[in-house]
Design a protein with these regions (language model features):
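Class I S-adenosyl-L-methionine-dependent methyltransferase catalytic core
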Residues: 1-146
Length: 146
């Protein structure tokens, strides 16, 4: 797909920042996770490569099934959250993950570490980062909104 086509698609879908995570992008995370735990993919829609990737490697993960992530509470039956949130809602996702008090991993751009509000949140609540040594290409073999 040409750069011009990407820009045109982005312009027609400006209200949507939906990007499907390539399945192989969960691999670096797996060594930090316990196979005896159940994880929640908060943005799994009709298909989720995060769900299929975890399943393929023998991890227990459940999708949202259309449930609004912001209705989730600490007592829900999962041990941690793993998701690629809509970038326009990354602050809300971060705050809600911290409020639930469960471990979480969010796929976010490195620039998400910046900002006074987020910086303060990370300083107060703590954070760890797993930085990939490659740039994730959300446009290869997947349908994106841009």
């Amino acid at each position: 797909m040409s750069y011009t086509n990407l820009i045109q698609r982005r312009a027609t879908n400006a209200e949507s920042d939906e990007c499907y995570t390539p399945e192989d992008q969960i691999l670096p995370l797996l060594k930090y996770l316990d196979k005896d735990k159940t994880y929640y993919e908060a943005t799994a829609g009709k298909s989720s490569s995060i769900l299929s990737g975890f399943d393929a490697y023998g991890y227990s993960i459940v999708g949202s099934g259309g449930r609004d992530f912001f209705d989730c509470v600490e007592s829900d039956c999962f041990d941690g959250v793993i998701t690629n949130p809509p970038y326009s809602k990354k602050d809300q996702f971060l705050k809600h993950c911290y409020a639930m008090g469960k471990p979480f991993a969010l796929l976010l751009p490195v620039t998400s570490f910046q900002g006074k509000g987020r910086g303060k949140l990370f300083m107060e609540m703590g954070m760890s980062a797993l930085v990939y040594n490659n740039r994730i290409d959300f446009t290869v073999n997947v349908i994106t909104s841009f």
